[in-house]
Structure formats: C-alpha cells, structure tokens
Swiss-Prot record:
It is a peripheral membrane protein. This is ATP synthase subunit beta. Belongs to the ATPase alpha/beta chains family. It is found in: Cell inner membrane. SUPFAM superfamilies: C-terminal domain of alpha and beta subunits of F1 ATP synthase, N-terminal domain of alpha and beta subunits of F1 ATP synthase, P-loop containing nucleoside triphosphate hydrolases. ATP binds at residues 151-158. It comes from the Bacteria.
C-alpha cells in the first residue's frame, strides 16, 4: 500500500503528496483514517506534477488537517453487488446507512465500468406496461430504454417515480435499484419507510447521496446504483429497473467540482465536460442479449427552461420523455403529464400495433384542437363555438380528466384507492370517449378513476 500526505484542502477537493514514482492512477480510490477511526474515501481526479494528485472527497472534509496520512487502494471505488444488497440502503462507497449491519456480498464491482460491447447489445423494441394510463397510451416506455421525467419544482416527479416502483415490484415482481442523487433527505426517508410498509423493499436496492452531501458523493452515487443494476443484468440475466432521482443533480455536482479542479466553465457556468460525463453514465444504461436495464430518470428543469444545457444534454439520450406541466397540475389533474409535449420512440404502429397507435393519435388530435380553441373560448365564450366544436371541447375535457388516475402511493393524500390499469382497458376507455359513447356523462365522472367502467359507476353517484 502506498501512503501519501495531505498537502492542501479546499472544500471537497483535497491535494495529496506521494513519494516520487508512487502516484495513484486517475480514478483510484484513496482513503484517510480519521482520528475517530472512520474512513473517508477520496477519488483521484488529476495529476499535478510528479508528486501531487488532486482528489475529490466522497464525504465531508471537516476535521481533516494537512499532513494526515492517505492510503492508496490501487483500484477504483468498489461497491458490493448481488442479491444481498436487496432491501438495503447504501451510500456512494457501498457502506450501509440503514443501521442493519454490514452488507456481506461475494462480489464487488467498480463504479467505473465500460459500456457493453456493440455486438452484445439487444435491438429488440418492446413496450413496458406501467399501469399508468397517460404513460401507457401516449408515451409508452420501452423495455431496456431510457425515460426522462421532466418537470420544475413541485409538479410530482418523485411521486410518479414512487408509483412506478410500486407498480413494477407488485405487478411484475422485478428488481429495482433506486439512486437518490442530490435530492431531499426527507423524501428518501419517506420512500424507504413506504417501501418497508408495502413490502416492496425486499426487491429494491437503495443508494443515496443527498443534498446535504459533498459534490463528490452526488457526482458518483448514480454510478454506484448503475453498477448494482449491471450485476443483475450481466450475471443473473435479469430485467432490472434503475430509478435516478434526480439526474440534474448529477450534472450540478459535476459543475461544483469542475471549478475547484481548475477547469474553465462553459455555457451557463456548467463544466466543459458536461456532455462526456452524461454520455459515460447513459451509455452503460442499456439492454444486452442477456438482460436489460430500463431506467426512469427524474430531470429537474431549472426555472422551467428546457433549453438549459443540463436538461438539453439529457434529452439526447432518451427513448421517451414524460413532461410534467405546472399548468396541468394547477387544474388538479395528477399525474400532471403534458400529453402533447411528452414523446416516445416506440409509439409506432409496427411496435405497439395499429389500435394503440390510432387511439393515441386521436387523443392527441382532440386535445390539440381543444388547445387551439381555448383562445376563442377565453375571448368570446363557449356560446360562439359551432356545435361541432362544442362537442370537441366536451370530449376533450373528458379525455383530459380521464388521463388522471389515483395513485397507490398517494392514497394518504387523496383518500382514494390506487389503480393499476391494464393497457387494453386504457385503450378501450379512450376509444369509447372519443367515439362519443359517453357524451351524456358529466365530465367529473372521469376524474381520478381507473377504468371507463369506474367512470360510468361514478356518474351514477353524481
């Protein structure tokens, strides 16, 4: 083991001097044993001359002093992988943070791994049912694909992710890995306790590097979660789900570290390596011929500006986008998915079939027509519309309300039982509304229900 000494500390960045000829390699993990016996992990980022390296700390550097001894492990950060991590909560370096003792796995993986080889990739396109009407109908997720949940602050990204974890664990009994990247610790705590209550925790591994942690941890924790998911894909040939909340914080942490590492900032103050860092992470999230990693990533949009470099870079990697809209949330329609702004690569008649494709296009068409008529309604009122347009508006408002749905994870807030709606039920419901089969029902009957039969039942009580 090579030993060095701390020469300078600037916030989360620590410079370490090593004897000549013993410099650690880039991305090697170093560790310091603090006076209280705890270990602090550093990751080598730059070589400054022949004897000094610049590193980024994975935990707070409070209490470190110059001259402390630093040990080079000779390899990158290694995290435990395998079925033993299911039901556990880990930090960025793979240490348990749930107070349930050590995680004893037979294997460890480096958090920095190569993307699968080109010939190993699978190109099969198939839909992945989530049980959430608006997603399954209008922007279907693909198995082994990447989906982005875009939204500003407080429109429901985390609730939607929690619902997806719940539905997938219960309906499809798949394994999930959740990486909490730079989000609120309270939300992570809520998620953990809700998972324990619902029993979903047994099929999920949780990895957290939250807002209160230094940028090194927030920049690397998504990679930790990804390595755990890759093990299930490559060694156990499973289809795994990887949830990242929030991918924007991954970029944000990179930009915090970048200036301290002496790099020139690029557009809007982001790091010049933004596209490379994002590419290295996203390229590993893929399907091979053995198994798949399907990822759902929440993407915070700063100031609701989709052209900001961070969300814009993430866009390029996605197969489907679910855009959450504040204007829809203000109508009380949850999930607040914007049906006209959200897209999916696999909404194609060759993949999902003609029936699904045509219904989705009809829904989008009627909602777009309603949107076009809204200016006229605002100025002249409903009475000035032709009979045909009045019918379009009436059906569009029913469609809009039918796109809402009660969630299992929100039962405590809504007082309504959660609903999982199968794809054929979803298609059937929207086809009937558009065909005018339910023109006589009040629009409130369609709000926060599951299937069309429930809407008909609800109408009887109104």
């Amino acid at each position: 083991m090579q030993e060095g000494k701390i020469s300078q500390i600037i916030g989360p960045v620590v410079d370490v001097d090593f004897p000549e000829g013993q410099l650690p390699s880039i991305l090697d993990a170093l560790y310091i044993v603090r006076p209280d016996g705890s270990r602090l992990v550093l990751e080598t980022q730059q070589h400054l001359g022949e004897e000094r390296v610049r590193t980024v700390a994975m935990e707070s550097t409070d209490g470190l002093v110059r001259g402390l001894s630093v040990v080079n492990t000779g390899k990158s950060i290694q995290v435990p992988v395998g079925s033993e991590v299911l039901g556990r909560m880990l930090n960025v370096v793979g240490e348990p943070i749930d107070g349930k003792g050590a995680v004893n796995t037979k294997k460890t993986y480096s958090i920095h791994r190569s993307a699968p080889k080109f010939e190993d990739l699978s190109t099969k396109a198939e839909m992945f049912e989530t049980g959430i009407k608006v997603i399954d109908l209008l922007e279907p997720y693909s198995r082994g694909g990447k989906t982005g949940l875009f939204g500003g602050a407080g429109v429901g990204k985390t609730v939607l992710i929690m619902e997806l974890i719940n539905n997938i664990a219960k309906q499809q009994s798949g394994f999930s890995v959740f990486a909490g990247v730079g989000e609120r610790t309270r939300e992570g705590n809520d998620l953990y306790h809700e998972m324990m209550e619902s029993g979903v925790i047994e099929k999920t591994a949780l990895v957290f590097g939250q807002m209160n942690e230094p940028p090194g941890a927030r920049q690397r924790v998504a990679l930790t979660g990804l390595s755990i998911a890759e093990y299930f894909r490559d060694e156990e040939n499973r289809d795994v789900l990887l949830f990242i909340d929030n991918i924007f914080r991954f970029t944000q942490a990179g930009s915090e570290v970048s200036a301290l590492l002496g790099r020139m900032p690029s557009a809007v103050g982001y790091q010049p390596t933004l596209a490379t860092e994002m590419g290295e992470l996203q390229d590993r999230i893929t399907s091979t011929k053995n198994g798949s990693v399907t990822s759902v990533q929440a993407i915070y949009v700063p100031a609701d500006d989709l052209t900001d470099p961070a969300p814009a870079t993430a866009f390029a990697h996605l197969d489907a986008t679910t855009v959450l809209s504040r204007s829809i949330a203000e109508l009380g329609i949850y999930p607040a998915v914007d049906p006209l702004d959200s897209t999916s690569r696999i909404l194609d008649p060759n993949i999902v079939g003609d029936d699904h494709y045509n219904t989705a296009q009809a829904v989008k068409q009627i909602l777009q027509r309603y949107k076009d008529l809204q200016d006229i309604i605002a100025i002249l009122g409903m009475d000035e519309l032709s009979d045909e347009d009045k019918l379009v508006v009436s059906r569009a408002r029913k469609v809009q309300r039918f796109l809402s749905q009660p969630f299992f994870v929100a039962e405590a807030f809504t007082g309504l039982a959660g609903k999982y709606v199968k794809l054929e039920e979803t298609i059937k419901g929207f086809k009937e509304i558009i065909a005018g089969k339910h023109d006589n029902l009040p629009e409130n009957a369609f709000y926060l229900v599951g299937t069309i039969e429930e809407a008909v039942e609800k109408a009887k009580t109104l």
